[in-house]
Structures are given as C-alpha cells and as structure tokens.
Amino acid sequence: MSRRERYSVEPIPNDANEFQDNVSFIHKFITNWLITDPSLRNPGSEKNVKAKNYQVQKHENVQFIYLCGGRLRSVKQKPINVVTGISILIPGILFWIFEAKWIWFHVNPSIVILFSYFWLITVSFFIKASMSDPGMLPRNIHVPYSISNANTSPKASPPDEYFNIISLPYNAEDHTGVGLKYCATCHIWRSPRASHCSVCNSCIISHDHHCVFLNNCIGYRNYKYFLWFLLFAVLGCILMSVISFIHVFYYRLGMETSVSTFRSSISKYPVSFLLCIYSLLALVYPFPLLIFHIFLTSYNLTTREYFNNVRGVKNSQNHFTNHFDTHSIFKNLYINWLGRARGFSLVRQTDSYQIGDLRFEKLDPLQSFSS
C-alpha cells in the first residue's frame, strides 16, 4: 500500500450526512415548534429567518414558554401547573388499574363510564385553562409620542390624562361612570375590567386573578374553562371517594367472604383506601374555591373587584357600583358559565412576524411612571 493511499481521508458517507440532517430537523422541531423559549433565540434572528409571533419576545420580564407552535403557553415560573396536572392524572390511572374492573362487575358499568367522563373533561378544561390565552391585550397601541427606529424614548411629556383614571360618559345620576386607566408598561388604554398582571407583565381583559396552580392568568377568554375545571374536579373527587368507600366497606354487605373486618379490607384493597383518602383531601381547596366563584358569578363580579372594592370597604364615600350586574342571579350565572362567547385572540401567536411590528417592540415606560 502506498503512502498516499495509507493517509488519504475517505469522504463522509451519505448515511452520515442524512443522520446529521435528521438530528438538525429533530432539534428544530423540538426547539421551534414543540417547546419554544423565545428568550433563548439570538437577537435579530427574526430578520434572517421567517419567524412566528410566538418566537419573537423583546419585552422585559415577559417570560413565556410556548408549546405546539404557539398554540399553548405557560409562564416561566415554578412548574406548579405540572404538579397539578400530575395530581389529576395519577388517581385516574390508579382507578382504571385497580378499581374500574371491580366496579364494572360488582356495582354498575355506568359508574366507570361516568367517572371516566368526569376525568377526561377535567383534564381537557385543565389544559385549556392553564395553557390558553386568557385575553392578553396587544402592547404599544396608544403610544403618546413619536417612534423612530433609532430611539424609543419619549419625545415629549404625554398629556395629563395618561396619568389619571378617566370615566366614560354615563346617564344614571345615582351611578358612577366606568373608569379607564392607561397602562404605562404596555402603552395602551385598558378596556373596562382589564388589569395589568405583575406576574405575566401583560394586560388581561376582565382580569380575574393569576392562578399559581395553573401558572396562568384567569381572564375573559379562559374564565369559563376555569369554572368548569373546578366543577368537574370537585365532582370527580366526590365520585371517586364514594366509589372507593363502597369498595372498602363492601364486606359489610356480606358479599365478600374473604374479608370480614375493616383492617383486612384495607389490607386487601390498599389502593381503594388510598384513593378514598386522596379524593377527600383533594376537596379541601377546590371545593371552597368553587363555592366562592359561584358566589362571584351570581353577581357577575371578578375576584379583583371583590377584594379591591367590595370586601372590607367601610367608607361610604368609596361606594362601588357593579355596572356589569344584570340584577338577576340566574342571568349572571348563565353569562359566566354558558352564555359568554370566548372571543378571538387579540395577539395571534401563530401568525407570521412582520419586521417592525410595534406590538412586539420594546418601548420605555412613560417618564412620569418610571420616576
């Protein structure tokens, strides 16, 4: 063998090139579609690569993670929503493994079907409430100064009304007007009932509260999902506790010859006893929260309105008027639970990003607010 043949470098096989292309495709699929963190993208990359709106994030302290091409989202915080989801999944799986067959043949198949329906609906509403757009308002719509490409600082002081709450015109003499407030961070006039969430750092339509267990704001577009999630979660826990209770104490009917005492029953069916205790403990927080939101929706109030204007207000001069109350409990309940349409998203994350779109640009807060 000659020296040239001995030290020559063979070309890379086509299989190796195809493997590298596959790895690159998988990496792009995972980081750009399946799970996307816009803060990890290189600044200015949207100018070279055709990007979607969810892949562009220039605002400070706005930390979202997007899933499935921007169709789902979650705030970059402690993953308490993951713990909540696991706490819903595990009891359902244990039920189907250890309880479903026994209930099907010893009690009634319809109970298994009913619980499965409750569980699936709970999971569905959990995903919708925790990972959908709650009604985020677009930024930089009402900027009180001219914008140039080189500088995004205010050119002049904005008018005084940008620093005060103004009231819309109203007819009734015994009612106060609906107040509007300008958000210095988002640079928009907020619609009535909208509020700025300090966690999401965004203005939300009909902002109710920021739920740490769902890791998402609860607003106009997902409040209905939140209500039904609470309802079916409570119903599922009650049904599971009853089913597990029946299984544990089935020996009392004299139909279980191998079990004669409570100790022997929980020794033979430990998962049934565990599910019974788990479902009862799981009711401690969701059940009172459900009752509280039934009360709020009966008056068409939000959580923020109740705690800021109703609860603990002793000064008669600070009279709060709920302009959204229809004065009918049933109509208020219908509006919040069934009647109100979800509406469309004002910031469509799946649309193609247009370079220079002011909604996604970083602008400094107004000077009077930042001082």
Curated annotation (Swiss-Prot):
Pfam families: DHHC. The keyword Protein biosynthesis does not apply. It catalyses: L-cysteinyl-[protein] + hexadecanoyl-CoA = S-hexadecanoyl-L-cysteinyl-[protein] + CoA. The chain crosses the membrane at residues 80-100, 107-127, 226-246, 275-295. Residues 181-231 form the DHHC domain. The keyword Hydrolase does not apply. PROSITE patterns: DHHC. It is an enzyme of class 2 (transferase). It is a multi-pass membrane protein. Residues 101-106, 247-274 are lumenal. Autopalmitoylated. Its main location: endoplasmic reticulum. Its EC number is 2.3.1.225. One of its GO terms (cellular component) is cortical endoplasmic reticulum. One of its GO terms (molecular function) is protein-cysteine S-palmitoyltransferase activity. Keywords: Acyltransferase, Endoplasmic reticulum, Lipoprotein, Membrane, Palmitate, Transferase, Transmembrane, Transmembrane helix. PANTHER family: PALMITOYLTRANSFERASE APP, ZINC FINGER DHHC DOMAIN CONTAINING PROTEIN. Belongs to the DHHC palmitoyltransferase family. ERF2/ZDHHC9 subfamily. The ERF2-ERF4 complex is a palmitoyltransferase specific for Ras proteins. This is Palmitoyltransferase ERF2.
